[in-house]
Amino acid sequence: MAVSSLSIRCGGFSPTISHKTEILCPNPSLKACCLLSSGGKADSSESTYQKGSGNNWKRRQALVGVGTLVATSIPATLLLAEEIPKSYSPFVDREDGYSYYYPSDWREFDFRAHDSAFKDRYLQLQNVRVRFIPTEKNDIHEVGPMEEVVYDLVKHKFAAPNQVATIYDMKERVEDGKNYYTFEYGLRTPIYATTSFATVAVGNNRYYTLIVGANERRWRKVKKQLQVVADSLKILQI
């Protein structure tokens, strides 16, 4: 992979169902660990990929309860048939075609230009959020090879100009015929640093991105917990 700015450095639950109202928002096996000096244009960490001002984004009200879940969503009933990891709850968005798990004690919140988001009660940097953009592609493989896709996302979409980005690991999984790229990366400034997992997939003419992360100082403690979240993203047929 020849990129001029790249230097190589080895190295019991409560289901949540989405019910939405339209509002106007005011505003992917690792071949090498990559140390990137970001040159992409961004307002803040990952802000370039969060662009969406002037588009119609959706704010949701969460309805909690197995009865509601079964009554409103067939894909959700299938999710219930699976073993939900202890201390996690499933989020199912039948309308937009995706689902994932999040820690049961996290709270829902609004994250600009994202379709859904949950965060730790006390640590704001410890959160998960999902967004999607339109695409004519049918699978993440059509976007490109995993190494190229991950590099482009981290360098050009996630990192701000004042951040150094490091890609630690990446992997691919196939589930129900759908391909997913999941990768671990860090963003660092002189003031603070974060580490995250991201999972990307394509389906329903949409490019889905899930990001779950935490402050770098807490990463060793919460990495396994957040890995479950990153690996849980599923594309549901609309």
Swiss-Prot record:
Gene Ontology cellular component annotations, sorted alphabetically: chloroplast; chloroplast thylakoid membrane; extrinsic component of membrane; photosystem II oxygen evolving complex; thylakoid
Observed phenotype of the null mutant: No visible phenotype.
A single GO molecular function term of this UniProt record: calcium ion binding
Keyword terms, alphabetized: Chloroplast, Membrane, Plastid, Thylakoid, Transit peptide, Transport
UniProt keyword annotation of Plastid present: yes
Top-level division of the source organism's lineage: Eukaryota
SUPFAM superfamilies, per database record: Mog1p/PsbP-like
GO annotation terms (biological process): photosynthesis
Membrane topology according to the record: Peripheral membrane protein
InterPro entries in alphabetical order: Mog1/PsbP_a/b/a-sand, PsbP_C
Compartments, as annotated in UniProt: Plastid, Chloroplast thylakoid membrane
A Pfam match: PsbP
UniProt similarity note: Belongs to the PsbP family.
Assembly and binders: Part of the chloroplast NDH complex, composed of a mixture of chloroplast and nucleus encoded subunits. Component of the NDH lumenal subcomplex, at least composed of PnsL1, PnsL2, PnsL3, PnsL4 and PnsL5.
Primary role: NDH shuttles electrons from NAD(P)H:plastoquinone, via FMN and iron-sulfur (Fe-S) centers, to quinones in the photosynthetic chain and possibly in a chloroplast respiratory chain. The immediate electron acceptor for the enzyme in this species is believed to be plastoquinone. Couples the redox reaction to proton translocation, and thus conserves the redox energy in a proton gradient. Required for accumulation of the chloroplast NAD(P)H dehydrogenase (NDH) complex.
Protein name: Photosynthetic NDH subunit of lumenal location 1, chloroplastic
Species of provenance: Arabidopsis thaliana (Mouse-ear cress)
